[in-house]
Amino acid sequence: MANLNQKKYPAKDDFPNFEGHKSLLSKYLTADMYAKLRDVATPSGYTLDRAIQNGVDNPDFHLGLLAGDEETYTVFADLFDPVIEEYHNGFKKTDNHKTDLDASKILDDVLDPAYVISSRVRTGRNIRGMALSPHVCRSERRAIEKMVSEALNSLAADLKGKYYSLMKMDEKTQQQLIDDHFLFDRPVSRHFTSGGMARDFPDGRGIWHNDKKNFLVWINEEDHTRIISMQMGGNMKEVFERFTRGLTEVEKHIKDKTGKEFMKNDHLGFVLTCPSNLGTGVRCSVHAKLPHMAKDKRFEEICTKMRLQKRGTSGEFTESVGGVYDISNLDRLGSSEVEQVNCVIKGVKVLIEMEKKLEKGESIDDLVPK
């Protein structure tokens, strides 16, 4: 809840100190804009100060903004719009997003299993009418858990599985699931603590997975749901087919049982807590062995030119182990799910081709995108 004493002071005395900050928040939030929006709140009571706290606390963060509900993006559009435009490659406030979940349009190419260890597609979805994780109250969070877990328990055939509440899970089991990359980590990072997303942990949180452990749903991590399809090897089409089928089933069961739908609009696509995930929310990734590419100074630049993102073996801010990298789509907003997945397939094929050439001591100059 906002401090009611705040209104006794002029907005200029409340403006954050952005000295040494690198975020898009610090670039676009002016004193005049802050004065205009400081005392405004969304219908559920989320304020500008809550939306920017994540960035105020962390000078090194790239964005520095989090939504507390679906309306955050319209009520505070003066700030969010320019941040979204710069982060999402020029996506303007007049642009519309496009959605395409047709698995038949995914390229048939199976990525070379000698280089690709595993493939994964994930997205986030939030339930309309409920606050997002920086602003959600305990009763809402528990209602989301009940709603989603009951919908998931309706899945059948190869998607049939079980829900595991973190409240009922012992520490050893929880850590094993984290180590196996099935479960999200405990919310101890600055992103979660500053953003108010670690509150009440592990209350209302859990993981659901099918019997084969290749279709998973995280409940109440950063978003209400994180829906994940994954498997060993490089058959991304198979991964995406299961992903879309499971996603469609979950949405249908939630709507049939509760009348609720996912947050979505024509402009931003699927509405998620962090502006970086707006649009498809899709992160299509592979773990690929690229030890020779890692020694090439152009590696990151090559990935960026192909609209790919390179991370360490265990994700963002981690190092590569044994030359294994996490390679994923860079874009989320303005292009469809099918386009983003196909971008990864095509790009990783090129990276593997480069790796093979480097193994033989050959030049990759002819393969480097201009």
From Swiss-Prot:
The keyword Kinase applies. ATP binds at residues 118-122, 181, 226, 283-287, 311-316. GO terms for cellular component: extracellular space. One of its GO terms (biological process) is phosphocreatine biosynthetic process. One of its GO terms (molecular function) is ATP binding. Its EC number is 2.7.3.3. The keyword Nucleus does not apply. Substrate binds at residues 222, 274, 316. Residues 115-358 form the Phosphagen kinase C-terminal domain. The N-terminus is blocked. It is an enzyme of class 2 (transferase). Pfam families: ATP-gua_Ptrans, ATP-gua_PtransN. This is Arginine kinase. Residues 6-89 form the Phosphagen kinase N-terminal domain. PROSITE patterns: PHOSPHAGEN_KINASE, PHOSPHAGEN_KINASE_C, PHOSPHAGEN_KINASE_N. The gene is AK. PANTHER family: ARGININE OR CREATINE KINASE, CREATINE KINASE M-TYPE. Belongs to the ATP:guanido phosphotransferase family. Keywords: ATP-binding, Kinase, Nucleotide-binding, Transferase. It catalyses: L-arginine + ATP = N(omega)-phospho-L-arginine + ADP + H(+).
